[in-house]
Structures are given as C-alpha cells and as structure tokens.
C-alpha cells in the first residue's frame, strides 16, 4: 500500500486493512524517491493506492478496495445526503474557528512529519467541499488537480483563510438548496473512479472532518484550547479513521 503522512484516506485504508487482517507492505512515498517511482510505474499519481503486482486501485473508496481484494465485507451504512450536508456544515464552521486560532508565525511551518505548511492544510479543509460543488455545478469530473488547487495570493493570513472558509460554507448551502436530486443517486466521474453523488458527498464531508481533527490536534500541541471542539456526537456516522494523524 502506497501512502503518505497526514493523508486522511491513507490512514483510513491502513486501519481498514489492519482491522480486517490483510497483510500488506507499507510504502510511504513522502520524501521517498524510490517509493514515488514505484507508484508512478503503476500508472498512479496520487495516494492512497492498494496494489497487487501491476494491478492497483485508488483507495479513496473502501468499497473499491473490498472489490479489488475480493474481501467478504459488508459496506458501512451511509448517512443520508441531508445528514451529510448538516455534518459538513458543522465541520466547516468549526474549522473556520480553529483557523482563526492558529498563531500567525506558525502558518508557514509544517506540522509533524508532513512537509506541508499549515496554511496549506487549513486551505485544503475548505477546498475539498468547494471542489466538489464546482464539479457538480459545472458537470465536470472531480479531478485530483481540482481538489489540490493551491490557495491564491489573497489567502495568506488566518483571517483570509477563515473568510474563505465562510464563503465555502455558504456556497455548499446554496448548492444544496437548489440541487434537484435530494437522494444524490446520480453518477459522477472522479479521479478515483465513477461513483454515485451520495458516495462522493460522503467523502466530501468526512475528508474535511478528518483534517479539522488535525487542526484540533495542532492547537492542542500548541497549548491552545480549540474554540468549540468537534465531539464524537458531531462526527457520528462519518467513516473516519480512529486516529487523527498517521505517523
């Protein structure tokens, strides 16, 4: 399995494989030229990836991993689309509060063993659902490049990022209010395959939720009490990893 630290789906997949007794070789591609080369030789450009020989599957969807490995495992029960929207709203509101608490001098520093500025992590929390909404509104594929689009020059400070987050939160609400298929049963193209909108919405909710947990962890390590912690009840029903960070 190919992964890197701080990657939400990587941690979730590793925990999933371990929990179900699947032995695997762990290849951390972060700062590992040989590991990254092996990943590219498969034909993949992003992680997590589960591979057998030259065959591989992107592991953003555990259902895809189950099919690829031919595991006899029942998929988890998803929250309804409305419940996912409500959870996402809680997460975005919380992340906006946390971003405002990050000391200015820390924004360009990395967190733990991931060589990525904290400012980019904070931006990524909001970019995930923003990219989903853009893909839905423009009827285009949800690409890796769309999700990983970097922040513009105007997003430098805590307040810049927080206001950006507030804008994304409002955009999600506007999209959902006018989206005609409340069951989210239609199919959409993504960089990890073709899936129902319901499944991609679920990922667009739990993925930023996991990063919001990482922002709480960051504040804890700085000795700052997060402003209104996300609780287990707040996150109940989202298919999150057990841990907030994978070392």
Where are these regions (language model features)?
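Local sequence-structure signature of Cys/Sec-based thiol-disulfide redox active-site neighborhoods
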Residues: 1-26
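Thioredoxin-like thiol-disulfide oxidoreductase module
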Residues: 27-45, 69
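Structural micro-motif
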Residues: 40-51, 60
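Non-catalytic, surface beta->alpha helical segment in thiol-disulfide oxidoreductase systems
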Residues: 51-77
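Short, charged, low-complexity loops and linkers
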Residues: 71-84, 153, 160
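Alpha-helical bundle segments that constitute or directly flank the non-heme di-iron/ferroxidase center
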Residues: 78-102, 123-134
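Acidic/histidine-rich alpha-helical segments that form the ligand environment
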Residues: 88-98, 153-191, 195-214
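Short, contiguous alpha-helical
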Residues: 106-151, 189-247
């Amino acid at each position: 399995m190919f992964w890197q630290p701080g990657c939400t789906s990587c941690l979730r997949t590793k925990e999933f494989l371990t929990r179900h007794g699947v032995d695997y070789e762990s290849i951390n591609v972060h700062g590992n030229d040989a590991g990254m080369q092996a990943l590219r030789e498969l034909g993949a450009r992003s992680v997590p990836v589960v591979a057998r020989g030259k065959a591989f599957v992107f592991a953003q969807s555990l259902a895809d991993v189950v099919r690829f490995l031919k595991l006899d495992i029942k998929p988890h029960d998803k929250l309804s689309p409305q419940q996912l929207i409500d959870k996402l709203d809680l997460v975005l509101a919380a992340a906006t509060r946390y971003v405002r608490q990050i000391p200015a001098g820390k924004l360009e520093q990395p967190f733990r063993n991931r060589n990525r500025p904290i400012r980019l992590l904070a931006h990524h929390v909001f970019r995930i659902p923003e990219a989903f909404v853009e893909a839905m509104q423009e009827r285009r594929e949800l690409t890796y490049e769309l999700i990983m689009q970097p922040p513009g020059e105007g997003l430098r400070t805590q307040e810049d990022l927080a206001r950006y987050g507030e804008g994304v939160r409002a955009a999600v609400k506007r999209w959902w209010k006018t989206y005609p298929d409340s069951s989210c049963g239609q199919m959409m193209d993504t960089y990890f395959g073709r899936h129902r909108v319901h499944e991609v919405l679920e990922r667009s909710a739990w993925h930023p939720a996991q990063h919001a947990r990482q922002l709480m962890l960051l504040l804890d390590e700085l000795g700052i009490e997060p402003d209104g912690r996300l609780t287990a009840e707040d996150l109940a029903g989202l298919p999150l990893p057990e841990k907030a960070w994978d070392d």
